[in-house]
């Protein structure tokens, strides 16, 4: 195919720019992110919601062993999409950083500070020869000074703060859905509801409590926790009921 | 003649009278004279015959010599000057100044094709014909496909017919409204959805000359040959107005231009540029409609997609349920199908399949019936065929890949 020949020479080395200023290996790493299932983050005034798709390939697989949601510190959680093993490395790094902060300053690490140190780490793998970039993106959610914060990291080492964001497969559709439906005044429950509906968008099979993971960082308590499968299921049921109701309304009209 | 013949048998008896002897001799003389005359005639005939054979011999030996001679070269006349003609040989592109007989000179003009011998003198003028390869692309025998053989693509077919048929049937309509008829349609869509089939139907249903070719035929080894073929192709089309040119798999030559330095790519691109200028360039295109088909729409160069070249970009999608049912009916027309076969159900059951897939199911179903030693194809056969095809097309399990990602 045309166009590939010239590209090939520049995607061999991670440290080599193409003539139009692109780092092909980093762009390929983003493709690895798209291979992962979707992870969604929604920030509300009451806290940050992380929802991940952890649909299992086999009914015999233990759902709890699918690593999509990670607790970083008491007040910080993360959702990943892409290369699982790479995600673990970054999560370990982030945990270490937050512990270093506690030992050094005796205070919980700021979410922005944590994100920056993680992305600095990621960035090194785009500038040093002999290595490859991280094939994973993270959503880092936490509370900083009572304020909920939501950051996204990218294989290039860029970080952005978001009100609501999706990473992983089908990202475009989900992000579009979030942009249409997001409201700044959502409660945490509304946030979970919104994220689950976004995840449901463009999925063929129905959501189930086992198939999703929900993590919440509560602004009041400043703690991160993950919902159990039956809790998630009740949120899903609520959505389905609401959908049925609106269907019924349609029928009546 | 003083030949004397001894011992001549005289036609009389010695005893006869003088008078009788004389008469007999006279009689003999006249017979001999007659014979002589006859012999002379035969001699003449033989001479003539001899001449004829002599000539034939000469002709044959001449021909024999000619056959042994080296063939003539083809060249194009570049220029006619007082000193002779400047010719350029085909192939090696060598130019030469050469002599031309006055007789030939009168008929020659710059651009004529001529045959030259070993010493490069012009032997004779050749027909100024377009490339043979372009000429053979004209379709004389219409394919045996009608519009009724196309299932489901009603909108697409209507658009194609509007572009191709309407301007020929009713050119006044366009004049009255004051628009130029659309000149080209590009059919694009996944494989097996009937793009070429539509073109075939158009070919058999219109009276216009139909010229078909595959994009890959335009790719040639030598620089300029592909472009020449494109030029000749449109020349052939112009000579046979109104005409429809169908280019199948146009992505072979019309893919996006890049900065690639490979000379092969560059040549393909030059061929495309010739196509661009033929389609909507400086020269009037004439009454020629163009249909092209591709399944790599994303690869096409933007220049070829602009209005004026392809006015209509028609997507040919996978058929919907109704379309599939129609396609089932079309492909089973000649089949001995049991009454119990429900095409509606089959169509509903075969989501995401293309027209070609449906055809494959019908063929497979027939095979199942044959294997079962039946001549009637039943619903069960169709279902088995569908399952078989499903298995064939199932992608390799991606579980190992997904294991790495979450």
Curated annotation (Swiss-Prot), chain A:
GO cellular component terms attached to this protein's record: cytoplasm; proteasome core complex, alpha-subunit complex
Tell me the protein family, please.
Answer: Belongs to the peptidase T1A family.
Top-rank taxon: Archaea
Main location, first listed in the record: cytoplasm
**GO MF, one annotated term:** threonine-type endopeptidase activity
Subunit organization: The 20S proteasome core is composed of 14 alpha and 14 beta subunits that assemble into four stacked heptameric rings, resulting in a barrel-shaped structure. The two inner rings, each composed of seven catalytic beta subunits, are sandwiched by two outer rings, each composed of seven alpha subunits. The catalytic chamber with the active sites is on the inside of the barrel. Has a gated structure, the ends of the cylinder being occluded by the N-termini of the alpha-subunits. Is capped at one or both ends by the proteasome regulatory ATPase, PAN.
* Activity regulation, per record: The formation of the proteasomal ATPase PAN-20S proteasome complex, via the docking of the C-termini of PAN into the intersubunit pockets in the alpha-rings, triggers opening of the gate for substrate entry. Interconversion between the open-gate and close-gate conformations leads to a dynamic regulation of the 20S proteasome proteolysis activity.
Its BP terms in the Gene Ontology are: proteasomal protein catabolic process; ubiquitin-dependent protein catabolic process
Q: Which UniProt keywords apply?
A: Cytoplasm, Proteasome
| Coiled-coil intervals, chain numbering | none
Question: Under which name does UniProt file this protein?
Answer: Proteasome subunit alpha
Q: Where in the cell is it found?
A: Cytoplasm
Q: What does this protein do?
A: Component of the proteasome core, a large protease complex with broad specificity involved in protein degradation.
- Renumbered to this chain, region (Disordered) spans 229-253
From Swiss-Prot, chain B:
Renumbered to this chain, the signal peptide range is: none
Q: Its GO CC terms? A: cytoplasm; proteasome regulatory particle, base subcomplex; proteasome-activating nucleotidase complex
User: What sections of the protein cross the membrane?
Assistant: none
Q: Name one GO molecular function term.
A: proteasome-activating activity
Compartments (UniProt record): Cytoplasm
Composition bias, Acidic residues:
1-12
Residues reported in the UniProt entry to bind ATP: 192-197, 331
Region ranges (Docks into pockets in the proteasome alpha-ring to cause gate opening): 404-406
Example GO biological process: proteasome-mediated ubiquitin-dependent protein catabolic process
**What are the entry keywords?**
ATP-binding, Chaperone, Coiled coil, Cytoplasm, Nucleotide-binding, Proteasome
> Looking at the keywords, is ATP-binding present?
yes
Region (Disordered) location: 1-20, 385-406
Positions in coiled-coil regions: 12-70
Family assignment? Answer: Belongs to the AAA ATPase family.
UniProt function note: ATPase which is responsible for recognizing, binding, unfolding and translocation of substrate proteins into the archaeal 20S proteasome core particle. Is essential for opening the gate of the 20S proteasome via an interaction with its C-terminus, thereby allowing substrate entry and access to the site of proteolysis. Thus, the C-termini of the proteasomal ATPase function like a 'key in a lock' to induce gate opening and therefore regulate proteolysis.
Q: What is known of its domains?
A: Consists of three main regions, an N-terminal coiled-coil domain that may assist in substrate recognition, an interdomain involved in PAN hexamerization, and a C-terminal ATPase domain of the AAA type.
- Quaternary context: Homohexamer. The hexameric complex has a two-ring architecture resembling a top hat that caps the 20S proteasome core at one or both ends. Upon ATP-binding, the C-terminus of PAN interacts with the alpha-rings of the proteasome core by binding to the intersubunit pockets.
Name of the protein in question: Proteasome-activating nucleotidase 1
């Amino acid at each position: 195919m045309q166009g590939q020949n010239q590209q090939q020479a520049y995607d061999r080395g991670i440290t080599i720019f193409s003539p139009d200023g692109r780092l092909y290996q980093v762009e390929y790493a983003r493709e690895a992110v798209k291979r992962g299932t979707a992870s969604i983050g929604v920030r509300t005034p009451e806290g940050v919601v992380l929802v991940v798709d952890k649909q299992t390939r086999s009914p015999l697989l233990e759902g709890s062993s699918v690593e999509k949601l990670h607790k970083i510190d008491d007040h910080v959680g993360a959702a990943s999409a892409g290369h699982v093993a790479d995600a673990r490395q970054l999560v370990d790094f982030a945990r270490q950083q937050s512990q270093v902060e506690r030992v050094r300053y005796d205070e919980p690490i700021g979410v922005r500070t944590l994100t920056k140190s993680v992305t600095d780490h990621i960035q090194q793998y785009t500038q040093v020869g002999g290595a490859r970039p991280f094939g994973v993106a993270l959503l880092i959610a936490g509370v900083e000074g009572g304020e909920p914060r939501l950051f996204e990291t990218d294989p290039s080492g860029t970080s952005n703060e978001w009100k609501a964001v999706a990473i992983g497969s089908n990202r475009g559709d989900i992000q579009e859905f979030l942009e249409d439906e997001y409201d700044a005044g959502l409660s945490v429950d509304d946030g979970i509801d919104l994220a689950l509906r976004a995840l449901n968008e463009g999925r063929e099979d129905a959501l189930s409590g086992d198939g999703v993971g929900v993590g919440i960082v509560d602004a009041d308590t400043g703690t991160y926790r993950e919902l159990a499968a039956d809790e998630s299921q009740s949120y899903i049921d609520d959505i389905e009921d609401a959908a049925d109701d609106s269907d019924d309304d349609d029928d009546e009209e | 003649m003083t030949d004397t013949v001894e011992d001549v048998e005289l036609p009389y008896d010695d005893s006869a009278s003088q008078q009788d002897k004389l008469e007999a001799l006279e009689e003999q003389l006249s017979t001999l004279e007659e014979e002589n005359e006859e012999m002379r005639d035969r001699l003449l005939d033989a001479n003539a015959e001899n001449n004829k054979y002599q000539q034939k011999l000469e002709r044959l030996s001449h021909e024999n010599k000619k056959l042994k001679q080296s063939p003539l070269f083809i060249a194009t006349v570049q220029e006619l000057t007082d000193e002779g003609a400047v010719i350029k040989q085909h192939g090696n592109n060598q130019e030469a100044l050469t002599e031309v007989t006055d007789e030939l000179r009168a008929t020659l003009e710059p651009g004529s094709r001529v045959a030259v011998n070993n010493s490069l003198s012009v032997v004779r003028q050749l027909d100024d014909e377009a490339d043979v390869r372009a000429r053979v692309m004209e379709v004389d025998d219409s394919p045996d496909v009608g519009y009724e053989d196309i299932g489901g693509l009603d909108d697409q077919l209507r658009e194609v017919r509007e572009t191709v048929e309407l301007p020929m049937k009713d050119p006044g309509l366009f004049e009255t409204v004051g628009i130029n008829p659309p000149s080209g349609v590009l059919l694009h869509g996944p494989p097996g959805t009937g793009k070429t089939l539509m073109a075939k139907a158009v070919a058999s249903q219109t009276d216009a000359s139909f010229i078909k070719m595959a994009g890959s035929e335009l790719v040639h080894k030598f620089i300029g040959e592909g472009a020449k073929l494109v030029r000749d192709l449109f020349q052939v089309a112009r000579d046979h107005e109104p005409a429809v040119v169908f280019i199948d798999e146009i992505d072979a030559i019309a893919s996006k231009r890049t900065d690639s330095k490979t000379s092969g790519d560059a040549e393909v691109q030059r061929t495309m540029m010739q196509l661009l200028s033929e389609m909507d360039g400086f020269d009037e295109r004439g009454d020629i409609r163009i249909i092209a088909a591709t399944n790599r729409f994303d690869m096409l160069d933007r220049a070829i997609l602009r209005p004026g070249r392809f006015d209509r970009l028609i997507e040919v999608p996978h058929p919907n349920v109704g379309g599939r049912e129609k396609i089932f009916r079309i492909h089973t027309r000649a089949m001995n199908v049991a009454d119990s076969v429900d095409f509606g159900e089959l169509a509903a059951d075969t989501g995401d399949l293309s027209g070609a897939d449906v055809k494959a199911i019908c063929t497979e179903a027939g095979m199942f019936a044959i294997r079962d030693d039946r001549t009637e194809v039943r619903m069960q056969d169709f279902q088995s065929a569908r399952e078989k095809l499903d298995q064939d097309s199932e992608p390799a399990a991606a579980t190992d890949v997904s294991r790495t990602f979450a």
